Amino acid sequence: MATIGLDKLYYAPITEDANGDETYGEPAVLAKAISAELSVELNEAILYADDGAAEVVKEFKSGTLSLGIDDIGAEIASALSGATIDLNGVVVSGSDDGGTPVAVAFRARKSNGKYRYYWLYRVKFGIPATNLQTKGDSISFQTPTIEGTIMRRNKVDYNDNHPWKAEVTEGTEGVSSAVISSWYTAVYEPDNPSPASS
């Protein structure tokens, strides 16, 4: 089903233990969402046997998240890009800035009124792009864009995989209302499915 909206753009800071496993901080509003474009790059290998493709393996390599937002405040700019805020409240960007990865959440409204929810487990953002334009005869909004690289997380799930994204659609059979209602209170942790009954 088609999506017709985008909102509730959040981020959660990441801290890593000695092994590099992530612990997520409390989610906070990143900005008002205008657009979100997610593209994924895959590693692919094809095994040829008997004059044809016998096996194909495709695995997540990395991705790119491009966010169009209404504004980026000083605290958010600092958290995402590594810029510093000086004693006068001025955001100072340096040549060696490189923010730490964060988790990112948002939701997309579907045409049936339900929402599809997302968590991207590890995104490292660059410096926000700024577009400026003088005021002419008509008003034209100029808004920032921020682009980040999506990576798999270091911490493994119950299958010893390294997840990079969690996604759920509201109203889908088997989806608990508790999962939806708590989506923005903490970064979603994959839950081990019950073994199939025989």
List each model region and its residues.
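Solvent-exposed edge beta-strands and adjacent loop segments
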Residues: 1-77, 125-143
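Intrinsically disordered, low-complexity segments enriched in small/polar residues
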Residues: 3, 8-9, 18, 22-23, 46, 50, 115-119, ...
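Short amphipathic beta-strand/extended segments with alternating polar/hydrophobic composition
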Residues: 25-31, 117-123, 160-169
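Intrinsic disorder/low-complexity segments
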Residues: 34, 104-106, 167
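Mixed-charge, glycine-accented linear interaction segment located at domain edges/termini
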Residues: 128-198
